[in-house]
């Protein structure tokens, strides 16, 4: 399965132990990962400004993701006008990377899941998917 994680899931995986860390580890071990340039940029900003991690730690996370995931940097724009520009970019990059699933905690993205061309699930929903649920 090709998996794309939104920024909020990756931040939670880095910042805390719990379901987000578990699903990211499971995806790294068992599936193919893609990451969009938008997520890489947002992740760096959050790690540096909100979590106040050192630049070296943010660089390490960026390098880790680039090593273990395919980076999607170009994607055609989407028409989901009810989404913020960054959310549209995250979804567009997931689609361009042929993700089977976008895992996010973003309520706006989860709200349009039924109309999206790929599966969009919460971290808990992805955990259930991994476990055959």
Model-derived features: where do they sit?
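A secondary-structure boundary/capping signal
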Residues: 6-7, 36, 105-106, 122
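Conserved glycosyltransferase catalytic-site signature
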Residues: 7, 87-88
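Acidic, PIN/NYN-like endoribonuclease modules and their adjacent C-terminal/linker elements
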Residues: 81, 88, 97, 101, ...
């Amino acid at each position: 399965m090709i998996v794309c994680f939104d920024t909020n899931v990756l931040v939670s995986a880095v910042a805390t132990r719990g379901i987000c860390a578990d699903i990211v580890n499971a995806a790294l071990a068992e599936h193919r990962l893609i990451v969009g340039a938008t997520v890489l940029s947002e992740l760096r900003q959050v790690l540096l400004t909100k979590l106040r991690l050192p630049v070296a730690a943010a660089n390490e996370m960026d390098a880790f993701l680039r090593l273990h995931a395919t980076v999607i940097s170009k994607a055609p724009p989407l028409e989901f006008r009810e989404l913020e520009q960054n959310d549209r970019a995250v979804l567009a990059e997931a689609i361009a990377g042929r993700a089977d699933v976008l895992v996010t905690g973003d309520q706006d993205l989860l709200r349009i899941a039924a109309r999206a061309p790929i599966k969009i699930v919460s971290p808990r929903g992805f955990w259930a998917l991994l476990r055959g649920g």
